Design a protein with these regions (language model features):
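Glycan-recognition and catalytic cores of secretory/periplasmic carbohydrate-active enzymes
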Residues: 1-305
Length: 305
């Protein structure tokens, strides 16, 4: 997450040292001499001391970021890395990096993502495996990985207002992430399976990571805090404004929003019972007359908008 945090610091302070350091981390990942080899030598160790079977793929350090073409390794770390790289691509307006990330997006969502927007299909390393390897019962599908996918999608949207990104955000918030928290908000899933047989989970070691009920807490409690953060900041994902001053409506929900454009403040009042009802009304109230564009997402699954 350091790349994301550094870009936020840059935006808050305007100090380019934070942006440059974030870019440095992106640029250095997977280059030679490999950081992990240097560290191992300093400790008088040989090779990696964790997840050795995955090698440097576990850390997304098997290749420089701009040479990677498939999602590999720890799924949460991968999503955060791609989100951080997208921040750098946007802030520096680097087209090459954006194109790499677009190909990576297509690999993740077209070949390595579940119908629920869960990602990361194997327990070992909480990681990706290979294209179309998406078992329903031994899935890992960590809640944090779907949240990271939303982070990645949001940043790609800021550069390319294509509905394919907001479609995945919507799919994740209603499925792959929402399954990670109980209705009362007190219990959580770390792993989000699509198929559960309680007796199998009890007796088969390769199913032990799959829980039949949401626990109240975890020793590694990243998901409860992350899912709470995501849903309390859901408004950040509903709209965006392009550099040209266009307002994009990405996610539908009952809400009111005040959006600042270059020379006018615009209030949007959205009324809907979505997703239970597909009817959505948007009242547009600018503070004074002016010309601007509002682009409303038509979901890819909507055949008759």
């Amino acid at each position: 997450e350091i790349e994301l945090a550094l870009v936020k610091m840059y935006k808050a302070t305007g100090d380019e040292k934070y942006l440059k350091l974030s870019k440095f981390f992106i640029d250095e990942r997977g280059t030679e001499p490999n950081f992990f080899e240097t560290e191992a030598e300093a400790r008088n160790e040989k090779g990696l001391n964790i997840m050795q079977e995955l090698g440097y793929k576990y850390w997304q350090a098997h290749l420089p970021v701009r040479e990677q073409t498939t999602a590999e390794g720890h799924s949460v770390r991968a999503m955060y890395l791609y989100a951080g790289a997208a921040d750098i691509a946007r802030e520096t307006q680097e087209r090459e990096l954006f194109e790499v990330l677009r190909k990576m997006w297509d690999n993740v969502t077209g070949k390595r993502m579940y119908i629920t927007a869960a990602v990361g299909s194997q327990r070992y390393g909480e990681s990706f495996s290979l294209d179309y390897d998406l078992p329903n019962d031994t899935i890992y599908g960590e809640t944090c990985a779907s949240i990271g996918l939303v982070f990645f999608a949001q940043r790609m949207l800021q550069m390319d207002p294509d509905r394919k990104y907001s479609d995945v955000i919507e799919k994740a918030i209603y499925n792959g992430i929402l399954s990670g928290i109980s209705l009362d908000g007190k219990k959580f899933f770390y792993v989000n399976p699509l198929e559960v047989a309680p007796e199998v989970c009890e007796h088969r070691v390769d199913h032990r990571h799959v829980k039949t009920r949401r626990p109240g807490w975890y020793d590694c409690a990243c998901c409860p805090a992350n899912v709470s953060r995501l849903y309390t900041s859901i408004g950040d994902y509903m709209y965006s404004v392009s550099r040209e001053g266009e307002i994009y409506v990405h996610i539908f929900a009952n809400n009111s929003a005040n959006i600042s454009l270059n020379d006018v403040n615009v209030e949007l009042d959205v009324k809907t019972c979505y997703p239970w009802d597909g009817n959505i009304s948007i009242d547009v109230n600018p503070e004074h007359a002016g010309e601007f564009t509002i682009a409303v997402r038509v979901p890819s699954w909507c055949l008759e908008p």
